[in-house]
Amino acid sequence: MSEDLVQQQGTPLGRYEYLRLGATTLSQLARASIIKGGLDDADRQRKPDGLILLPKGGVKAVIEIKQPQELTAAKIPSVIKVYCPIARAISGCNVIIFTDGQKSLWVNPHTENIIQYNGKSVTTVFDPKAVVAQALSPEEIRELNDLVEMADQTISATNDALHSAPILDPTPLAERVWQKIWVTTGKEPEKCLYNVVEIFVFKFLSDIGVLTGTYSFGQIVRQTKHGNDIALDHYASIVRPQIRKLFPKGPDGTTIINGTIFVNEKGEANHSQSSLFTQVLQDFQDFDDENGSMKNIDRQFKTRLFESFLRQSAGIKSLGQYFTPRNVVQTMVRMSGAEKLPKGARIADPFCGVGGFVLETIAEFPSIQNQFVPKNKRIKPDYHFRGYDKGSDEKDDERTIILAKANMLIYLSELLSRYNDADYLKEFADSVFNETFHLLRSNLGTFGLVDEEPFDLILTNPPYVTSGSAALRQSIRDNALDDYYANAGRGTEALAMEWIISNLKPGGRALVVVPDGLMNQRKVIEQIKERCIVDSISALPSRTFFSTPKKTYILEVTKKTDEFEKQTTPVLAYVITEIGESRDARRIPIQQNDLLDLERAHRYFMVDKDGYVPSDPRARVISWDDFDGLTQWLIERQWSVEDRKTLNLLEERSEVDEEGFLQMVSSTLEDLQEYISEVRNEQA
């Protein structure tokens, strides 16, 4: 190994590091695994003055240090011709920087042309002495990092112009890392995902310049050279406390991270997983080496990250918390008209899980997302968003709301990339993440919130398990809330519907995913008609939620402004066969997406309820007199068997395993017991 490599350690330069050389050949660099790929014989003895590289990753730029007299206009062409072969010889290197410390030229080694950005030659100064002395400002480091990354991702043998790095979809990385953690540890799938998300947040915050120096992702990667335990100790004792400091806990005690595979419940390093931790870091670094930083994240990754991994989780399934497919969420959001609400409007998901309805509402409408742009270092959105989830003092119960907050960070990644000093981050934590999502530490969860200020819009998919609802009702009685839920029907979904209606403002709207069991309960139906205007009911196909074959519906209501108001307007009924993705374990995109046609029919209907005549065979406008006479709201039955066959609406028989069958029997038994109890109470 050369004396350079023995004596020199790389100098941190944002997410990269600078390696000062001079006497080291490319051949020696290859033997030290600093450069990858083969070398031609003619290139082996070439000696770069310095390199910019990812720690334990690839070389991104070659540095050539010259005297000022060597960088005159007359001599630059010959200097470029002589030294560009050094950078060309290094696989993946797309830029060579010539510098005298005061003046610099950024050159494409493949074409030997000066690199252009916004129509001008790139001459941003790279001063090796200032880099080694770590005398650069954060702004200067960020500018150099941005230029190096753009060159890495966009410069080629056919392109000399820099442009923004491409939008990144890290789904393959997330899947690979999740699989690795799951196979290695044997932990539940959702626990594995918590740790994927935590490392993702760590990498993202490093890439946007929030975590720098000793707190950065690159620093932890460098620590792995000294041992896996040392790297994990540094992460657990130094980095995680810094993330918690930057994003303080909310009143409920939760923040944006809480993985417990790489650390224990006390936050101490779990050395039994040090090797796995190092492997995961390397996976992230390899992805960065090939694709660039996490700064520009594809929206589809944001929207489907949690759904992809948690859809089949047994732990989630047993609680009835079926993750709503994002196509369904987005359709409900677009039907809601959230962007037209007045200033000061309140929007909620009272059973929010990882926050999909709230976050998709923010992401769908630019006018709403712009409300989260800081002004004078304060964030005061015009709308007030709330997401509630049930928990306890157990660490496992905190994780869903922590995921919701981390999910919000990912959704707002573009804003965090632009506004990321400590003051801004604390404001995002206090006024956005902690203000939006709340863990309710009680057996009642949301059902215990009876004095909440009412909402203009509620979008939700409440839990709809029947098993266990008797215990929940007992808790309601124990907390003297019987009167509040006196009119609720059977099952948790009926309690949820009672809460939703009670917590809407007069004139407020709700779009709710409900199961067929609710649509069969005459008591619930009558209560909804008494207190709300029924706008639409859309029948979703079986297996919309992969975890269950249960038939579900999108119920849309508007709370009456006058309790004596009688509905006269018709109701839009819509039947859906396909939701734009296969309804099996793969959930791959498919061409047919009836949800889009539902949105179109809904737009026309809401403009002119009495005059709308649908041409879509999946849509029906049911007069109020006819609708009011229905004893159940299984609206697909408004189509004849022949019509349903034509529309491919006849459901196939669903098979369930033994556990699923026992759950169905248990739920049915509890349902019957509640029904008998209701009848006896009415007769008493």
Per-region residue spans from a language model:
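Active-site metal-binding core of divalent-cation-utilizing nuclease and nuclease-like domains
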Residues: Q7-G57
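Active-site-adjacent loop/helix micro-motif of nuclease/hydrolase catalytic cores
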Residues: D41-Q45, A61, Q69-I80, S582-R583
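Conserved catalytic cores of phosphodiester-cleaving nucleases, focusing on short active-site segments
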Residues: G50-I52, V59-Q69, Y83
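A conserved structural/catalytic subdomain of Rossmann-like adenosyl-cofactor enzymes
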Residues: L71, V125, K129-Q134, L449-A684
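Nucleic-acid nuclease catalytic cores
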Residues: T72-G119
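Domain-level recognition of nuclease-like catalytic cores that cleave nucleotide substrates
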Residues: G101-M150
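Long recognition/docking surfaces used for binding and targeting
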Residues: V201, I208-S313
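Conserved S-adenosyl-L-methionine
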Residues: T324-E453, L457, V465, P515-G517, ...
